[in-house]
């Protein structure tokens, strides 16, 4: 594993202004410059409905990027233009029985390339070697595009009354064809570069995973990163649009950024990083995640946990350099990049079952691991074991035996593989700070079936709950005594 000595040294040179600088952080209020949607799927006859809202009185240009779940390779990307107070919606659905995913929208907001009424098909070029990156070791078929996660990153604010602003602003004329921007056809990959400035915040997003036939409905909020950049992220030298690796701050080294996390009492801890993606990872770090489960057979209940590591590919994919890099310990090889963890499953009366790595883990001897960038952990039903939970995922690398019919679980992300941690951060005094755990987002999804409903009536009751989390660090005692991430997944 490569060391980060040079990165740490660069970060130490930049900490004198860290407290006052723009810094990337997870916004608990839900709006920001960059949005992360932890999961989309079209498996199991499901569709994923997505929306993004511009809450500000200024237009935005954003990169929308869909990444498959094995290794975080791109499957579809395009530029979205949001006028002031605009809302954009779309649906991800399955193209055919043996096909991949396809994006469909009837929304009038401008995109480049333009999304036709027939939809935009997800592509395998990001991982099969026919695109700009070499093929990876994951599945090469188009069905790999059916599950993954989504990024929407604002790359610039559109200058008011500029050519681009006029082109993308919806014209409300009171007619049936009203509300349509007049200049979508005039946009190109570069036409707007001179009409944008550094982006401000104000985006929020939602997603819903729907199975019409079963009547299931799993809705969640996108995670929002604020302070992602203080420069425009679209330019002649960066025409492909921003990714999570493009976080930056003018007070950090070129290519670097500052992250804000928070002490338990709410005081911010600013850490400078020489590489932008490390600051994003810092904002998302958790040493443990917490949530509930329910698998009561009398309720027909089932539970999945979505556990997504949205920056993982930058540390484990050989296309981005030699790896693996901490906080991850295993490169993406033979279709997996395992992350060893420890899980403690509690029933409602404090009884606990521990799943290793540990010396003695009675009564179940399982070493749990998350194999992919997007992971779906399924809680098995004690009466009828299952291999796929309510989300019907093909990315279920961990089946968790529950402790009773319902309760809570804690997944320790710091303990495995000899210890997961992110080094390279420096506080305002120049002291090195290492964050324990992994960068993670996700939620719990459950479904309950009412077997007493009238025949022919849909009787599924679904819900989602965002993961909660804690984070710890090694560094100055006053700063690292008890630390949590900004939003607390």
Regions found by a protein language model. Name each.
Residues 1-22:
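Gram-negative bacterial Sec-dependent N-terminal signal peptides
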Residues 74, 88-89, 97:
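N-terminal interaction/assembly modules
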Residues 58-61, 71, 159:
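Short loop/beta submotifs within extracellular cysteine-rich repeat domains
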Residues 63-80:
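Short beta-strand and strand-turn-strand segments in soluble, beta-rich domains
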Residues 52-58, 68:
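Asparagine-centered strand-capping/turn motif at beta-strand->loop junctions
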């Amino acid at each position: 594993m490569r060391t980060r000595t040079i990165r740490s040294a660069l970060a130490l040179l930049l900490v004198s202004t860290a407290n006052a600088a723009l810094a990337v952080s997870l916004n608990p209020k839900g709006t920001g410059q960059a949005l992360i949607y932890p999961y989309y799927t079209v498996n199991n006859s499901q569709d994923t409905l997505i929306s993004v809202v511009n809450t500000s009185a200024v237009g935005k240009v954003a990169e929308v990027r869909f990444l498959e779940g094995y290794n975080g390779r791109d499957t579809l990307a395009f530029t979205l233009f949001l006028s002031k107070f605009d809302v954009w919606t779309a649906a991800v659905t399955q193209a055919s029985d043996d096909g991949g995913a396809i994006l469909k929208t009837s929304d009038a907001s401008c995109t480049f390339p333009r999304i036709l009424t027939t939809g935009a098909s997800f592509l395998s070029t990001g991982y099969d070697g026919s695109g700009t990156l070499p093929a990876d070791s994951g599945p090469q078929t188009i069905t790999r595009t059916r599950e993954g996660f989504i990024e929407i990153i604002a790359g610039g604010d559109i200058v008011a009354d500029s050519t681009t602003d006029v082109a993308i602003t919806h014209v409300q004329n009171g007619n049936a064809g009203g509300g349509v921007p007049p200049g979508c056809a005039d946009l190109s990959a570069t036409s707007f570069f001179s009409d944008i400035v550094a982006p401000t915040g104000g985006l929020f997003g939602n997603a819903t995973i729907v199975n019409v036939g079963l009547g299931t409905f799993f809705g969640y909020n996108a995670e929002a990163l604020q302070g992602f950049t203080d420069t425009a992220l679209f330019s002649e030298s960066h025409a492909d649009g921003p990714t999570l690796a493009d976080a930056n701050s003018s007070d950090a080294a070129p290519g670097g950024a500052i992250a804000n996390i928070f002490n338990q009492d709410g005081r911010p801890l600013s850490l400078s990083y020489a590489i932008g993606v490390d600051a994003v990872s810092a904002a998302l770090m958790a040493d443990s995640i917490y949530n509930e489960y329910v698998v009561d057979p009398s309720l027909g209940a089932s539970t999945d946990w979505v556990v997504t590591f949205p920056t993982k590919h930058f540390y484990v994919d050989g296309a981005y350099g030699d790896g693996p890099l901490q906080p991850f310990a295993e490169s993406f090889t033979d279709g997996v990049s395992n992350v060893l963890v420890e899980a403690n499953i509690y029933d409602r009366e404090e009884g606990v079952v521990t799943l290793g790595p540990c010396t003695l883990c009675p009564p179940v001897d399982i070493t749990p691991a998350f194999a992919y960038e997007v992971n779906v952990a399924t809680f098995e039903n004690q009466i009828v074991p299952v291999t796929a939970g309510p989300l019907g995922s093909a990315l279920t690398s961990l089946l968790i035996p529950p402790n009773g019919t319902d309760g809570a679980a804690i997944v320790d992300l710091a303990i495995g593989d000899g210890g997961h941690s992110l080094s390279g951060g420096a506080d305002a005094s120049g002291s090195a700070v290492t964050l324990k755990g992994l960068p993670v987002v996700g939620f719990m999804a459950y479904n309950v079936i009412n077997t007493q409903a009238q025949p022919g009536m849909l009787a599924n009751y679904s819900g989602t709950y965002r993961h909660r989390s804690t984070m710890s660090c090694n560094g100055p005692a006053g700063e690292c005594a008890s630390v949590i991430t900004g939003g607390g997944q």
